[in-house]
Amino acid sequence: MLIFFHPKFDIEPALNPVDIKEAQAFRYKAFGMVNESGLDKDEYDQKFNHIIIRDRRHRKVVGYFRYTCYSSGSRIQNGYSAAHYDLKALERFDKPVLEVGRVCTDPLANDPDILRLVWAYLAQFVEKRNIVFVFGCTSFEGTDYKKYIDCFAVLRARYLGPKNMLPSVKSQSVLKFAKKFRSEVNLKTAMMKMPPLLRAYLLMGGWVSDHAVIDNKLNTLHVFTGLEVSKIPPAKRRFLLKIP
């Protein structure tokens, strides 16, 4: 088990049904979902490890993510991302890879340390397990792509993955932004509009798919996001390992 100390937050695994249900309720609110159960739950919850970040004083959940480790790229077809993207090109990895999902924070908490703790945990896990590739689906709020045209134009221009690793289309409802958005945009403005999680991936050397999936269940647009651990700038890697 990875151990962290932070003056305001506790980061801990959800190990029992009560904690997992609390996490599912938090995810439901964070993603703005609407259903009768009031929970965001799926069949992958049984396959993933769940991590909760709590406000130490009130024990309130303020952050969450789930993850699972595969011994090689040949095993990723059983994961969440593979249900939305054709990941056959990533079977090339012959060392451990890590899938991360459902990363969310409490917007009312408004504290960047919550997301930093997510990355700190993942950085230590990557080091401990010799992970070579980190991946997942990174979401834009809502399904109206017009709000994010600048973001998609920048992703197309600067952050598409290598051709020999790009996921192919698998979902029926997709936005092929690499073919659609070619306009010049203000990079600084576009990066400010970018979801914080995706921005962090990109700043560490991450890349995205050439299309987004329109996920009506989660009320999001999401892109496949990949990060080759060897491409993370050394200074950034050292910084993450020193948090908190």
Name each region found by the language model.
Residues 82, 238-244:
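Short intrinsically disordered coil segments
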Residues 62-63, 210:
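A structural microfeature
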